[in-house]
Amino acid sequence: MTVASIPPHAIGDLQGCCSPLQTLLTALPANAPLRFVGDLVNRGPDSLGTLRRVIMLCEGGRARAVLGNHDIHLLAVAAGVRKLGKRDTLDDILGAPDCDALIHWLRHQPLAIFENGFLMVHAGVLPQWTTGDVLELAGAVERELRSPHWKTFLTDAFGNQPAKWSSDLIGIDRLRLTINALTRLRFCTPDGAMEFETTDADGAPDGHVPWFDVPGRRTRGTPIAFGHWSTRGLVMRDDLLGLDTGCVWGGKLTAARMTLAPAGREVIQVACEQAQDPLAHKK
């Protein structure tokens, strides 16, 4: 079997946890293609080492990655439009001699990947979107991040509004909503209004459901690999592969084979030392 014909393994949120990544890599087949679901950096003890390792894997042709909310936060801090939070662990990247090169690489990564029938995003997709819509909307954001005016773009890219999709949205509102859906979404209403405050898997606000449980979701039937939701943990359904199993919180780092047939989705997990206290995070 050639490398190109081997199904990739999708890997959950790293968040700067390099040691578990190294352990996981030794447990995977040496030639297995890798797909990272985003949040490569932040909150863990070695954001710099983690990012450099992922870049090495990607530039070597073995891996691909999508951007998560923590990755975009790093871009904004590097651009000077956001400040570090008290639990951020990004100083090692920002102070690295190759910081500019690392940021350049990061801002050229996609927000969505569709290959071999599998869609991959960091957080979720809105129920009104088709797979084609996801790729088109993600592409518009990607062009801004890769452009010479990327710092100016990020100045206006943050905020919770608009929270509801409309095909009439234009400009920065359309781009901001796209970023929020692809990198922050957990719960939404059946008509696609997003809610960003609730993280507990069993704590759905009134009128809201997990994005993947919305009746009539237009991507239903297309397998989607995602991360972002550590309190929900491993999600294994015919058309869902949720891989954030809380490595940075002392959970596990998870890889799963991305096969269209659910029976082929072998799961490999390694234990992680706790780098952040989830209870302190909620205070």
From Swiss-Prot:
Record-listed E.C. numbers: 3.6.1.41
Protein name: Bis(5'-nucleosyl)-tetraphosphatase, symmetrical
NCBIfam families for the chain: apaH, PRK00166.1
Keywords, sorted A to Z: Hydrolase
InterPro entries tied to this protein: ApaH, Calcineurin-like_PHP_ApaH, Metallo-depent_PP-like
HAMAP family named among the record's database cross-references: ApaH (MF_00199)
Protein purpose: Hydrolyzes diadenosine 5',5'''-P1,P4-tetraphosphate to yield ADP.
Pfam families per the UniProt record, alphabetical: Metallophos (PF00149)
Catalytic activity from the UniProt record: P(1),P(4)-bis(5'-adenosyl) tetraphosphate + H2O = 2 ADP + 2 H(+)
UniProt organism field: Ralstonia nicotianae (strain ATCC BAA-1114 / GMI1000) (Ralstonia solanacearum)
Protein family per UniProt: Belongs to the Ap4A hydrolase family.
Molecular functions (GO terms): bis(5'-nucleosyl)-tetraphosphatase (symmetrical) activity
